[in-house]
From Swiss-Prot:
GO terms for cellular component: cytosol. Homodimer. One of its GO terms (molecular function) is transaldolase activity. It comes from the Bacteria. It comes from Shewanella piezotolerans (strain WP3 / JCM 13877). This is Transaldolase. Keywords: Cytoplasm, Pentose shunt, Schiff base, Transferase. Signal peptide: none annotated. Pathway: Carbohydrate degradation; pentose phosphate pathway; D-glyceraldehyde 3-phosphate and beta-D-fructose 6-phosphate from D-ribose 5-phosphate and D-xylulose 5-phosphate (non-oxidative stage): step 2/3. One of its GO terms (biological process) is carbohydrate metabolic process. Transaldolase is important for the balance of metabolites in the pentose-phosphate pathway. The gene is tal.
């Protein structure tokens, strides 16, 4: 019998949630996703020192201002890591916009254009890139404009149905609804343990998937942020699942049979009229878990971006 990972691949596109090139080579995913925390982690791998040096030298060639150099080096390093990953995966790389821009639509669009241009200068077409944005109202509005330009987006830090619905109505290419972080919140809030089938994160993604398929939305659902393989197995059949190296390893060493749990709708019905900003903000605000986890996620990504910039500043100043 094929291992669990190989059983999953025919029914769900497997994406590697890592910047570790060796892990990507090992598990042969279709796509890969990165974020500021993963870029920070990857920057500490000795084999990546040339990518950092290249980013530093490029940043110095672009400006004499240290703060601008730090920003440029961070963008170039994220793209350099993406370029290495694209040598391995046949599909796409997701590269994230600075989390500190999560409430600034105009700045998010400008950063997306800069990242796409850096990939273009390296010979990579935008069709192989997904721009990652936080699922704030401003991030969703930025994604709507980028999608209209033909730049596909991956809306991340998604914890609620309101966020998912707004993304679909904006014509976003892909969403990354989080599973494990939802489970974390409910376990802390209730003190309960949950089976994989009852896992609040699994229930959330299943609900979003079914809504999209029932209403004929083309937005891809890519479950993310897993705490265990049980969550992954319960979401077999989801459009895509982005999985970290430790759980990819566990799945490849397992022979648990896979049963497709998520199935496309046999017929579709018309969706409701699109949400207004006021409606989105109210419905999102009604979900304390989503409010807390989105804010926490943005803060944590911003902290890791800051740590990366401290490292880059030291390199630029040496």
């Amino acid at each position: 019998m094929a291992n669990t990972l190989e059983q999953l691949k025919p029914i769900t596109t497997i994406v590697a949630d890592t910047g570790d090139i060796e892990a990507i080579k090992r598990y042969q995913p279709e796509d890969a996703t990165t974020n500021p925390s993963l870029i920070l982690k990857a920057s500490q791998i000795p084999e990546y020192s040339d990518l950092i040096e290249n980013a530093i030298n490029w940043a110095k060639s672009q400006s004499d201002d240290l703060e601008q150099q730090i920003e440029d080096a961070g963008d170039k390093l994220a793209v350099n890591i993406g370029l290495e990953i694209l040598k391995i995966v046949p599909g796409r790389i997701s590269t994230e916009v600075d989390a500190r821009l999560s409430f600034d639509k105009t700045a998010s669009i400008a950063k997306a254009h800069k990242l796409i241009q850096l990939y273009k200068e390296a010979g990579i077409d935008k069709s192989r890139i997904l721009i990652k944005l936080a699922s704030t109202w401003e991030g969703i509005c930025a994604a709507k404009e980028l999608e209209q330009e033909g730049i596909n987006c991956n809306l991340t830090l998604l914890f609620s149905f309101a966020q998912a619905r707004a993304c679909a109505e904006a014509g976003v290419y892909l969403i990354s609804p989080f599973v494990g972080r939802i489970l974390d919140w409910y376990k802390k809030d209730t003190g309960l343990e949950y089976s994989a089938a009852e896992d609040p994160g699994v229930v959330s993604v299943t609900s979003i998937y079914n809504y999209y398929k029932r209403h004929g939305f083309n937005t891809v659902v890519m479950g993310a942020s897993f705490r265990n393989t049980g969550e992954i197995i319960e979401l077999a059949g989801c459009d895509r699942l982005t999985i970290g190296p430790a759980l990819l390893e566990e799945l490849s060493n397992s022979n648990t049979p896979i049963i497709q749990k998520l199935l496309p709708a046999t017929e579709t019905i018309a969706a409701q009229p699109a949400m207004s900003e006021a409606q989105f903000r109210w419905e999102f605000n009604e979900d304390p878990m989503a409010v807390e986890k989105l804010a926490e996620g943005i803060r944590n990504f911003a902290v890791d971006q800051g740590k990366l910039e401290v490292m880059l500043k030291a390199e630029l100043s040496s």
